[in-house]
Amino acid sequence: IPFIILLVFLIPLTLLLIGKSTGPTGAIVPLTVAAIPLFTRLVDTSLNEIDYGVIESAVASGASLPLIVKEVLIPEAMFGIIQSITLTLINLIAFSAMAGVVGGGGIGDLAIRYGYYRFDNFTMWITVILLIILVQITQYIGNSISKQFKKN
């Protein structure tokens, strides 16, 4: 579902849960609903990429399920999990910019209200540049952290 449609679709639920459907607080429910399935799918992919032989050897050595999760699955998938967090954060930046279009506040609201509606190209350029910088910083930090967990 395109996020802008999800935003509008979830207005009644947001109103019910939070008591308001606009502003930064009103954007929390749609952002959460959009981010959770994305993140869980990415983590699922990371966990599925673990070599089954590693898991099999942990089971053969008699490790309990909680121990396998803690000592095998999470460490083996940590690189992918951190990359998943990074990608989810980048998508949340994009989603939050779209939330500004429907009154969610933030940089998207600034771009629409002062850039688009007032035909202020300078403001539009600045908001686009700020979003690009924010995404690049997020990507750089995520890559820097995930490098520490990369398996050769």
Residue ranges and their predicted role:
Residues I1-L6:
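Transmembrane alpha-helices and adjacent helix-loop boundaries
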Residues V8-L38, T123, T127:
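Loop-to-helix entry region at the N-terminal start of transmembrane alpha-helices
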Residues T25-V29, V33-I55, I85-T86, I93-A97, ...:
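Membrane-embedded alpha-helices of multi-pass transport/permease systems
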Residues L47-A77, Y117:
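Short helix-to-coil transition segments within interhelical loops
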Residues L65-S96:
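Transmembrane alpha-helices
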Residues A94-L130, K150:
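Glycine-rich helix-loop "coupling/hinge" segments at transmembrane-helix boundaries
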Residues W125-N152:
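C-terminal transmembrane helix and the adjacent membrane-cytosol boundary/short C-terminal tail
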